[in-house]
Amino acid sequence: MTFTILPAVDVVNGQAVRLDQGEAGTEKSYGTPLESALKWQEQGAKWLHFVDLDAAFNRGSNHEMMAEIVGKLDVDVELTGGIRDDESLERALATGARRVNIGTAALEKPEWIASAIQRYGEKIAVDIAVRLEDGEWRTRGNGWVSDGGDLWEVLERLDSQGCARFVVTDVSKDGTLSGPNVELLREVAAATDAPIVASGGISVLEDVLELAKYQDEGIDSVIIGKALYEHKFTLEEALAAVEKLG
């Protein structure tokens, strides 16, 4: 199975943006989300990672636009941001997204996420954003600003609840072009049988190939944002490179 690359489209107030370490107010705009999505589709993407940052930060929603864009695409979409209850989950799935990522609610509502996983199976992935604090990996919620508990305890709980996939982000790496935290990603992959989507820090093509080496350990995909928007390498180059790995 070929390693999957998901170009990221982060949306704020109807614009495609990138943030530095996920912090509100650090947005850099890259045009419209539809333009970005169609560009990545044209360049060969099979999946796209869409983030509604306004919903994630509890300051509005880009839902209608997201649904419209998903409807115009021929590729699979993973959708995340502000999905915290049945209503927002069903609305996200109604866009036609193949997969929905849940972050804060997976940390704060253990019974609800267990029920969502049971009902929707592989359509649900859990977004685990972490930051190293006093030597311990702590999960982050509410747009990455609140503490959500010890990483390994959260992972064990969600694993036992049957979570089909985890998206793992080292917050300190996100949007920094400083390289992924390969060691952390491998440790998380070793602690669960569910596949891992790596996120945060990709800066050069070698970073993608480094992660792809650990496909047999459970890291089967990577989300790439700023590196593509800042032209550090092209999506075509990345897809061709992982294709060669087989």
Curated annotation (Swiss-Prot):
<comment type="similarity">
    <text>Belongs to the HisA/HisF family.</text>
</comment>
<dbReference type="GO" id="GO:0004640">
    <property type="term" value="F:phosphoribosylanthranilate isomerase activity"/>
</dbReference>
<keyword id="KW-0028">Amino-acid biosynthesis</keyword>
<dbReference type="InterPro" id="IPR044524">
    <property type="entry name" value="Isoase_HisA-like"/>
</dbReference>
<keyword id="KW-0963">Cytoplasm</keyword>
<dbReference type="InterPro" id="IPR013785">
    <property type="entry name" value="Aldolase_TIM"/>
</dbReference>
<comment type="pathway">
    <text>Amino-acid biosynthesis; L-histidine biosynthesis; L-histidine from 5-phospho-alpha-D-ribose 1-diphosphate: step 4/9.</text>
</comment>
<dbReference type="GO" id="GO:0000105">
    <property type="term" value="P:L-histidine biosynthetic process"/>
</dbReference>
<protein>
    <recommendedName>
        <fullName>1-(5-phosphoribosyl)-5-[(5-phosphoribosylamino)methylideneamino] imidazole-4-carboxamide isomerase</fullName>
        <ecNumber>5.3.1.16</ecNumber>
    </recommendedName>
</protein>
<dbReference type="InterPro" id="IPR011060">
    <property type="entry name" value="RibuloseP-bd_barrel"/>
</dbReference>
<dbReference type="GO" id="GO:0000162">
    <property type="term" value="P:L-tryptophan biosynthetic process"/>
</dbReference>
<dbReference type="InterPro" id="IPR023016">
    <property type="entry name" value="Isoase_HisA-like_bact"/>
</dbReference>
<feature type="active site" description="Proton acceptor">
    <location>
        <position position="10"/>
    </location>
</feature>
<dbReference type="InterPro" id="IPR006062">
    <property type="entry name" value="His_biosynth"/>
</dbReference>
<dbReference type="InterPro" id="IPR010188">
    <property type="entry name" value="HisA/PriA_Actinobacteria"/>
</dbReference>
<dbReference type="GO" id="GO:0003949">
    <property type="term" value="F:1-(5-phosphoribosyl)-5-[(5-phosphoribosylamino)methylideneamino]imidazole-4-carboxamide isomerase activity"/>
</dbReference>
<keyword id="KW-0368">Histidine biosynthesis</keyword>
<keyword id="KW-0413">Isomerase</keyword>
<dbReference type="GO" id="GO:0005737">
    <property type="term" value="C:cytoplasm"/>
</dbReference>
<dbReference type="Pfam" id="PF00977">
    <property type="entry name" value="His_biosynth"/>
</dbReference>
